[in-house]
UniProtKB/Swiss-Prot annotation:
UniProt binding sites for S-adenosyl-L-methionine: G84, F89, D107, S108, T109, A135, E136, R154
Top-level taxon of the source organism: Bacteria
Classification via InterPro entries: rRNA_ssu_MeTfrase_G, SAM-dependent_MTases_sf
One Gene Ontology molecular-function label: rRNA (guanine-N7-)-methyltransferase activity
Protein name: Ribosomal RNA small subunit methyltransferase G
Organism: Microcystis aeruginosa (strain NIES-843 / IAM M-2473)
Family statement: Belongs to the methyltransferase superfamily. RNA methyltransferase RsmG family.
Keyword Cytoplasm among UniProt keywords: yes
Main location: cytoplasm
Keywords, sorted A to Z: Cytoplasm, Methyltransferase, rRNA processing, S-adenosyl-L-methionine, Transferase
Lineage: Bacteria, Bacillati, Cyanobacteriota, Cyanophyceae, Oscillatoriophycideae
Amino acid sequence: MILPELFDLWQETLEWQPDGAQQARFQQLYDLILEGNQRFNLTRITQPEEFWEKHLWDSLSGLAWLQKSQPDLLTKSLSVIDLGTGAGFPGVPIAIAYPHWSVTLLDSTQKKINFLEEVIDKLELNNTKTRLGRAEIVGKNLKHNCAYDIVCLRAVGNVDICVNYALPFLKKTGIAILYRGQWSAQDSLSLEENLGKAGGKILEIASFTTPLSESVRHCLYISKK
């Protein structure tokens, strides 16, 4: 199956669009996901337009606020880690879109790490590596503690737990991006209380509508105090 290109939609919504080589890698990633799904369950999202929106576009939407608020930051050589990456989202699309960044894909499941090693090899993502382990343990490792400019977490678990996983990986000036669905004012109050105890603070809570299905998504941007 062929992925839609939707270059204009990329530009309109995220003020970015893939070049030809990046689009080819997105297609190759899609092909590998479809093939991998025959061996083990990677994702239920396999139709071309849904894959484009819920995996590719959604992965890069987390950087939209940074693009607007700190555009110079994205031009630097940043270190990024994707916690609980699963099939490689958002980490692999980020690595494709920002080849000057160093991206680490962390997951606790060996078969997913094996699959991601295959993806990295076939897409020739020289800026990307994997790490097998659990976030709450790896974050205490001296090599990874306070080591990253950007920490991404697209897991659907409890947000307070996600924050506690993310903060140890952050440099003092780093930013954690938590991808969420629905979000409320009460959620913000609860998060602020937990962050106060954990030594973090909310920089921004961005709300946006997905371009095809028009569903509401949120990204939380968090830093250390």
